[in-house]
Structures are given as C-alpha cells and as structure tokens.
UniProtKB/Swiss-Prot annotation:
Its expression in hepatoma cell lines may lead to increase DNA synthesis and thereby participate in cell proliferation. Belongs to the dTDP-4-dehydrorhamnose reductase family. MAT2B subfamily. The gene is MAT2B. Widely expressed. The keyword NAD does not apply. Residues 319-334 are annotated as: Required for interaction with MAT2A. One of its GO terms (molecular function) is enzyme binding. This is Methionine adenosyltransferase 2 subunit beta. NADP(+) binds at residues 37-40, 60-62, 71-72, 93, 97, 159, 185. GO terms for biological process: one-carbon metabolic process; S-adenosylmethionine biosynthetic process.
Amino acid sequence: MVGREKELSIHFVPGSCRLVEEEVNIPNRRVLVTGATGLLGRAVHKEFQQNNWHAVGCGFRRARPKFEQVNLLDSNAVHHIIHDFQPHVIVHCAAERRPDVVENQPDAASQLNVDASGNLAKEAAAVGAFLIYISSDYVFDGTNPPYREEDIPAPLNLYGKTKLDGEKAVLENNLGAAVLRIPILYGEVEKLEESAVTVMFDKVQFSNKSANMDHWQQRFPTHVKDVATVCRQLAEKRMLDPSIKGTFHWSGNEQMTKYEMACAIADAFNLPSSHLRPITDSPVLGAQRPRNAQLDCSKLETLGIGQRTPFRIGIKESLWPFLIDKRWRQTVFH
C-alpha cells in the first residue's frame, strides 16, 4: 500500500505470540521510482531508501510483493499512484532498452519510451514533482565525441530515436523536468543477461571455446550504483534550487570495447583471456550502433554531483556470485 504509516510485526515470547500494529517513522521526502524491478531501478530505489527518503518503486510483471504493480501504459493507473503518493521526485527508469527488440517491436517500444514518458511528465507536473527521465548516449551518432548536453542529437537506430522522442515528450509536458543521459550499465545483476556487460562472463569463463568479441565500438561502462547516486544528488540539489532542470550527462570515464571489458573481467578473476578474439570490423547484424558516443559530464561535475566506481572493482563485486565453481553462492548471498 502506497504511503502506509503503520506496519504489522510479530511479538514472540515463550508461551505467547502476538500480532501488533506499530507506528512507522517514514521520511518526509518521497520518491517514486519506475522500472524498480530492473537493474538500474533497483539501484535507484535502494540509494534513495538508504539515504532518508521514503522510496516507493513500481514495476509491472515482476513487481509483487516488494513494489507497486503499475502499468505505465494505463494513464489512470499512473494518475492514481502519483496523486495518492504525492512524490517530491520521480525517477523514470522504465524503458525498452534493447536496441534489437525496439527494431522488431517499434510500436510497443514507442508506447513505453515516448507516450508513457510524456504522460508521466504531465502527471508529475500536476503534483509539482521533480521528474528525472533516464535517457541514453544512443541519441548521438558517435562521430564527434565527447558530446555535451547542448550538442545536436542524431540517433542511428530506432532505440536512440525513441529515447530522444521521450526526452522531447518529457520536456514539453514538464518544463521543470530533468533528462539524464547515461551509457552502457552494469551492476549487481539477478542474471547475467540483465546487462550487456555482465552477459559476457560465461564467454570469459568457458576458456576451452574461442569467442569473438566486438573491438570496434567504444563504450564507457558505468555502475548502476553511481547513476543512482547521481539521481539522488540531483534530486537533493533540486529541492534546494528550482533552477536545477534540463539535460545532464553522466558516465564512467574508462573507455573500453567489449573485447577490452572481457579481458578486464578475465584479469579481475585471474582467468585466461587468450580464447577471446577481437573483432575490429563494424557490426553488420542488428540495429546500427554509434562508434563512440562518449558523454561530457562536466555540467554535473561543476555542480558537485558525481561518483565513479573503477571498472575492475565494480565488475568483480557484480560477478563473483556467478563464478562457475562458486555458483551455489547465489542462493545464499545474491
């Protein structure tokens, strides 16, 4: 239940067991996180919750029991949760983020990435909530990095176009909103396929089989907990300064191809990497990708906002539960 102020607890002593309703001290600052079941959304929800915010997350298929189940394509459902909870901040993480899926399901992707984002922005404006819309470095074509916030976007694929159209829909419906563009993400995944970085781990571990790895596209892997920290810092700055709005960039600062990431992963776990083969040609299958869409983050850095986890440290923290000889640990620790 959104905004509850009481919870049930069990009081047990030998010979007696009572169910007691107790008052709960809920922080005054309220944040709503969409896509809270996803890799980034989980990190954002956790970051706010651990820093004296009353955080409510919403999801759809995987929402229960931890999060509110909300279909973002249902405008009535969106209206009700926002007007019932009255958040000070909304972090909109929900999106179709897989470029190849967007190419194959353009209408469904546009409904979520564009239409739902515009409606969320309108509802946020109605209650005076500060909306942070999570966008992507794929709004740029990758031919002239690094990109500043005011540089003209030119997406190469439909995913980038839907994220750019989502930005426009958000800012048209909510003049006080913020757009946060970010690159490829990794972090504490529930399964390796949840991130385009962590999904490489099995190829790294199975060293008896050669694996082709992209060595063409330049990426800047970014830990979700760093993005979550930036979202919280941005929200807290905004609560003190209403002029904090518009478009912002955040990114890790270690430039790597997927081949270089895979080699770094192997090195972090003292695994061989000689079976990994760098492919320097431009990919011919799937949605077109930008060669180098590096983001200039100086605007946020000037505001004193930012956090960066070194890739070697972050990836080791994220992947150790998935080591083949220690995979049983997932059931205990992950």
